[in-house]
């Protein structure tokens, strides 16, 4: 069961626009993590949620679970719900970190904060397996997690980075101009990216960026394999069991090992 659930969640982490409904009224923007030129142009440095999630995936797939855990925590600092779900799974299974079911529940509760179905299912599975003592500790631990990693604290951090990095890339504080072109060094010289693609508002406007993620993760493909109770959600899943905590927007950012980022996100599985 552990292997199936991890495989499902890892697969979900690798999916972006492919999970969107085919009848969506507004077509999704191109997946930036599937475009080598966009990654080379510095897209990931401006999107730390995706950047550190990709690092976490690479470390996890390489079997370096301890470092993967650190990268998923850092992505979580920037409101990345899939990474919060991976932190929970690793705590639940004892991968790269000591097994801690109570803390795992708190992280999965956090991952389910926006009502994403896959994470809600895992959260309820965790809860049903906890002892009464672990349930009490999960709620206590969860308050501190929400203060640091909940949307009230993490989304303003991400919004600050998106706005700052967009100004840097365009070279102007007036915002994006439609005729901006981006040049990326390649094997045959410089290659050009159309600015209208790179600067799609859904990548840079904080509210639209969250809505883009919501459209991907609200009903993703995770939790749709045979992992028992994950598939059995009540019609109205309960809201968070953890009390509201005062957000700590200025909390210290988790630290991660240095890694070569030149090919980050460009290596595909065989």
Sequence positions of predicted segments:
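Bacterial N-terminal signal peptides
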Residues: 7-18
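Sec/Tat signal peptide C-region and signal peptidase I cleavage site
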Residues: 20-24
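Extracytoplasmic and endomembrane cell-envelope/extracellular-matrix remodeling and assembly machinery
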Residues: 25-39, 50, 120, 130-257, ...
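Short helix-capping/linker turns of helical repeat alpha-solenoids
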Residues: 44-52, 58-65, 77-84, 93-95, ...
